[in-house]
């Protein structure tokens, strides 16, 4: 289990999607070269756990008739659903994507990890550039919303380090917090040493992979009944040893998150990029 396996898994899915996407585009569209398939979120980062959903964004330039786009998308997606794949998808133009991202922080966050899979690579690149530019430009609006969402999530899911059956993704100190730290770093608000939580991310991700692999229907909560099996698979002596390391990993993430918000509060909202520029 590890990053290499997650990337290999993503690459295998990419290949299958690419063939199907291009075939369907050629069969249903008058200008198949003007659409693109991209991955966003965790799949966009190439971090695909065994039971993860596939987050897809299908882009087009608006020149095709809507009924052709619908027929194309259905022809592409229905066989994937029939195979049992869980797919969260959106179909948008560049301008639609940009507009929605300014209104919905979840969309904005997902676009930060956008990765081209097939079709018009220039269109994919333009949307990725828009996403990063708008995230940085609107950080004073987005970061308070991100902070609030993190606080709300902690209320719902608790703190990973102190839970008997933690949600590895949603709990405080888990994978979603690590992704939030990446987003904050990309905003330019403050510099963040993400290397400080690299080992934490690797461990929590590996635990999640084993959890998904042992039970494809499982989600992200590490139940007591699963802990011994996961521990032995990863080379720990028992569940207690595993959970001790998971708690340490979560506390490292939690500490970096607290430190990051403290630094942002100390700047009074003035970005690190702008401070450095003014100091020259």
Language model: regions and residue ranges:
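Conserved catalytic core of two-metal-ion nucleotidyltransferases
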Residues: 10-18, 24, 59, 67-122
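Extended, Lys/Arg-enriched charged tracts that mediate electrostatic binding to polyanionic substrates
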Residues: 14-18, 23-24, 28, 33-36, ...
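Active-site nucleotide-donor binding segment shared across nucleotidyl transfer reactions
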Residues: 18-70
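N-terminal membrane-targeting/anchoring modules of bacterial envelope and secretion proteins
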Residues: 58, 75, 123-124, 128, ...
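Short, polar/flexible loop-turn hinges at active-site or ligand-entry regions and domain interfaces
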Residues: 60-69, 117-118, 137, 188-193
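A glycine-rich phosphate-binding loop feature that marks nucleotide/adenosyl-phosphate handling sites
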Residues: 92-100, 224-228, 270, 274-276
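Conserved nucleotidyltransferase catalytic core and NTase-mimicking acidic/glycine-rich helix/loop elements
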Residues: 135-272
């Amino acid at each position: 289990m590890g990053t290499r396996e997650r990337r290999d898994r993503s690459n295998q899915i990419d290949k299958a999607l690419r063939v199907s996407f291009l075939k369907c585009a050629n069969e249903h569209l008058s200008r198949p070269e003007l659409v693109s398939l991209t991955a966003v979120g965790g799949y966009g980062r190439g971090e695909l756990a065994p039971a993860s959903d596939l987050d897809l964004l299908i882009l087009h330039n608006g020149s095709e008739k809507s009924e052709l786009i619908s027929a194309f998308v259905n022809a592409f997606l229905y066989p994937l659903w029939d195979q049992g794949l869980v797919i969260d998808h959106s179909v948008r133009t560049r301008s639609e994507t940009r507009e929605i991202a300014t209104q919905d922080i979840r969309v904005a966050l997902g676009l930060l990890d956008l990765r081209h899979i097939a079709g018009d690579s220039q269109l994919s690149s333009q949307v990725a550039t828009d996403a990063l530019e708008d995230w940085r430009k609107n950080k004073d609006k987005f970061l308070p919303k991100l902070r609030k969402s993190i606080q709300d999530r902690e209320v719902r899911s608790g703190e990973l380090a102190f839970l008997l059956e933690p949600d590895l993704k949603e709990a405080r100190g888990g994978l979603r917090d690590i992704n939030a730290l990446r987003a904050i770093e990309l905003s330019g608000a403050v510099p963040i040493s993400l290397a400080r939580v690299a080992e934490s991310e690797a461990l929590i991700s590996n635990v999640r992979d084993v959890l998904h692999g042992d039970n494809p229907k499982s989600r992200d909560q590490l139940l007591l009944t699963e802990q011994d099996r996961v521990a032995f698979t990863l080379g720990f002596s028992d569940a207690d040893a595993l959970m001790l390391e998971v708690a340490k990993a979560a506390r490292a993430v939690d500490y970096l998150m607290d430190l990051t918000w403290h630094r942002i509060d100390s700047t009074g909202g003035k970005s690190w990029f702008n401070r450095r520029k003014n100091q020259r």
